[in-house]
Amino acid sequence: MFYFRGCGRWVAASFTKLQFPLARLSSDSTAPRTPHFDVIVIGGGHAGTEAATAAARCGSRTLLLTHRVDTIGQMSCNPSFGGIGKGHLMREVDALDGLCSRICDQSGVHYKVLNRRKGPAVWGLRAQIDRKLYKQNMQKEILNTPLLTVQEGAVEDLILTEPEPEHTGKCRVSGVVLVDGSTVYAESVILTTGTFLRGIIVIGLETHPAGRLGDQPSIGLAQTLEKLGFVVGRLKTGTPPRIAKESINFSILNKHTPDNPSIPFSFTNETVWIKPEDQLPCYLTHTNPRVDEIVLKNLHLNSHVKETTRGPRYCPSIESKVLRFPNRLHQVWLEPEGMDSDLIYPQGLSMTLPAELQEKMITCIRGLEKAKVIQPGYGVQYDYLDPRQITPSLETHLVQRLFFAGQINGTTGYEEAAAQGVIAGINASLRVSRKPPFVVSRTEGYIGVLIDDLTTLGTSEPYRMFTSRVEFRLSLRPDNADSRLTLRGYKDAGCVSQQRYERACWMKSSLEEGISVLKSIEFSSSKWKKLIPEASISTSRSLPVRALDVLKYEEVDMDSLAKAVPEPLKKYTKCRELAERLKIEATYESVLFHQLQEIKGVQQDEALQLPKDLDYLTIRDVSLSHEVREKLHFSRPQTIGAASRIPGVTPAAIINLLRFVKTTQRRQAAMNESSKTDQYLCDADRLREREL
């Protein structure tokens, strides 16, 4: 009999007598008969599906626990993926062999690259997604993933045991307790609870306990986390009403067609499943003063707006927009929900007014005069955990082998959740096999920026990814996510397939070869002008001009360059992606050199590790103010670089910490050298004894 300390109670269990509480849907014929897994993932949303499949790809026997299997892959809010900053996350998730990008390519009904007026480093790939197709394709993928078992069930509590002495944390998670009292054991547990922790839905003055419309919240688990000592906050979000397509007058609205050709999210796909000519348009309309009037006259009927709980700054409700920006017109994008769906999603009209007032407001808008509301908009309020309580691997400081991913960490958006899910799944698996964590730094990816911001700065409002948050965005582009992460994912995490790894290696070597060839081809400027007349090349240049420099001109691409110099450039035009990436590399060549130097400087700071067991409150070897000590104690940064980004930690404190780290490293090196010398002398003594 083994005993585990639960939240304020003792949980007793015998490993030999455990019975599995419910029949499970398994894609793994080798799933254990006893309920013991390597990794348990709680929640089947966008973070949970990525976490579960990532852990399984890494070789861990994984259990995905969800309230309902038929809601796996459900897009609870907007029917779209990607956007500015978010599209970068999608490419990075795909580079680590995640699911959502490939599923989007199979399910998209309208593809558009945003930010085209700017450089390719900040282009944002976005797609409208068929909700029904996405859910079907995701469930098919999940239920056919080796080593992954899916089970319906709600988690009420965590099973805890004594901590591992070599790691920080006051206890260790070793399983979960379901609402029916049954238990399942695991080496690592990942919480991806979304908006379900003590979630409530708000419409007007009415509130209902729910994580989303039609699904029950998670109460017991929220209480467990609070009793364990986690700092819990409260956030809110919302979704707009759904409108009947047939009731909208599209003929008077501004029509927006998809890009042709469509750019896929996944590096493994050359095209998307639904051809551009078969894709659906979106339409644009605007609010007007009558909308403002309805909002302002009925604030007393809207408890969600009156709440002090913080909502998403960059996806506000229409009520928030009217209050913050009075007398302005606001865009409303009418987005299709699927190829055969009768519903339209009015992006920009998230609201929590009473249902009858929602329809009254909508019919004030141009093109929606006869619109019928099929489902009212509603708000959701839910618990989240201060993300400064987790490490860059997404493991919690308080409880060993417990990982958080998704909205539980204070983020908003499918893409942010998916990115965290992949990292949590990888690291939960690596923790089981006692391997070093897989951490993406700020210099390596948008995922690194996302996690670093959360773990060092925390958040008091739903966090959304933007390109403006990234210091090295010229290097961290959507086109090169595979070069940055796929090779690492294969070698350091084991989460990338052999086929994807080989493709990334081929692309990397082809790019290096292509750039080398382009640098080697040189002609006079006048000759280049004759070869490519459309290029605005100045003929007054006296020095030879490289083909790589010619490719920098906006009018020139690899096709026109290959026509001018067929050999050896023609072969680089056969792969469209390779040709486009060579163009991008040429565009940024001069600035990338300087940015790489800056990255090296940052990496040096990141390489200076702070001792994991450092007690900032009592340490005497470093001069720190009481305020700085408290901030460092709460956030527990792992590197000097991370410590420098914590608000309130002064440059003087960083210098003192830097001195402390270097002194500690010198002492450790001296001790290691002394130990080697002692070992050498001992070996010499033994050798002499044998000779005698």
Curated annotation (Swiss-Prot):
Record-linked InterPro entries: FAD/NAD-bd_sf (IPR036188), GIDA_C_N (IPR049312), MnmG (IPR004416), MnmG-rel (IPR002218), MnmG-rel_CS (IPR020595), MnmG_C (IPR026904), MnmG_C_subdom (IPR047001), MnmG_C_subdom_sf (IPR044920)
SMART domains: GIDA_assoc_3
UniProt feature coiled coil, ranges: none
Modified residues annotated as N6-methyllysine in this record: 508
Subcellular location: Mitochondrion
GO annotation, cellular component aspect: cytosol; mitochondrion
Cofactor dependence: FAD
Residues annotated for FAD binding in this entry: 43-48, 155, 218, 407
Any one Gene Ontology molecular-function term assigned to this protein's record: flavin adenine dinucleotide binding
Record: transit peptide: 1-25
Catalytic activity: 5,10-methylenetetrahydrofolate + uridine(34) in tRNA + taurine + GTP + A + H2O = 5-taurinomethyluridine(34) in tRNA + 7,8-dihydrofolate + GDP + AH2 + phosphate + H(+)
Transit peptide among keywords: yes
Domain of life from the UniProt record: Eukaryota
Protein keywords: FAD, Flavoprotein, Methylation, Mitochondrion, Transit peptide, tRNA processing
Entry's Gene Ontology BP terms: mitochondrial tRNA wobble uridine modification; tRNA methylation
Family from the record: Belongs to the MnmG family.
Assembly with partners or alone: Homodimer; forms a dimer in the presence of potassium. Interacts with GTPBP3; forms the GTPBP3-MTO1 complex composed of homodimers of GTPBP3 and MTO1.
NCBIfam families: mnmG_gidA (TIGR00136)
Purpose of the protein: Component of the GTPBP3-MTO1 complex that catalyzes the 5-taurinomethyluridine (taum(5)U) modification at the 34th wobble position (U34) of mitochondrial tRNAs (mt-tRNAs), which plays a role in mt-tRNA decoding and mitochondrial translation. Taum(5)U formation on mammalian mt-tRNA requires the presence of both GTPBP3-mediated GTPase activity and MTO1 catalytic activity.
PANTHER family named among the record's database cross-references: GLUCOSE INHIBITED DIVISION PROTEIN A, PROTEIN MTO1 HOMOLOG, MITOCHONDRIAL
Protein name: 5-taurinomethyluridine-[tRNA] synthase subunit MTO1, mitochondrial
Native species: Pongo abelii (Sumatran orangutan)
